[in-house]
Design a protein with these regions (language model features):
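Charge-rich amphipathic alpha-helical interaction elements
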Residues: 1-167
């Protein structure tokens, strides 16, 4: 039985903190990959819109100039939690899977894809993003349970804030 299967009340304080830290890192990685998938889907949707309107949104081979405008809809007023030091998640298995999905679809040059290829690519991205979102939700639920147990232990005196300074 792994730490992720255990009831948080069965973990000692060190295990509880370690599992919470591990899941926070996993959440960061999953969130990063989810944002990448959403950005790639935004680019594909912009290409699809350009085909319908007849106005080139992405010039062939050069997307970089359009990125702020195309991806601006995902920018928010701030983080929902305090920021943690950023890590490079480009080698995370989900990031590699997304890169392979995009490479297999020929997404490097969206304007050269046929309408059918673009549609298939968008479907694959949407399915991938939904799967990653579900995984992220499951990580959040586990983090919430671990955090609630930590709070309970501090509140009930089973753990002390002074103990954090000793760690």
């Amino acid at each position: 039985m792994s730490a992720t299967d255990l009831d948080p009340t069965d973990l000692d304080l060190a295990e509880l903190r370690a599992e919470r830290a591990r899941l926070q890192t996993l959440d960061d990685a999953v969130s990063y990959v989810r944002r990448l998938a959403q950005a790639r889907l935004d680019l594909a949707m912009a290409e699809k819109t350009a085909r319908v309107t007849g106005e080139a949104v992405i010039s062939s081979g050069d997307v970089t100039g359009e990125l702020p405008r195309l991806l601006g809809s995902h920018l928010t007023g701030g983080a929902a939690r305090p920021p943690r030091p950023a890590e490079d998640f480009s080698d995370h298995p989900l990031a590699i899977e997304l890169d392979e999905l995009c490479s297999d679809a020929g997404s490097a040059d969206l304007p050269t894809l046929t309408d059918d290829q673009l549609g298939e690519y968008m479907t694959a991205l949407t399915e991938f993003e939904h799967r990653v979102s579900l995984q992220r939700k499951q990580v959040f639920e586990r983090l919430d349970a671990l955090s609630a147990e930590l709070v309970r232990r501090y509140r009930d005196g089973e753990a002390s804030v002074a103990g954090l300074l000793d760690d």
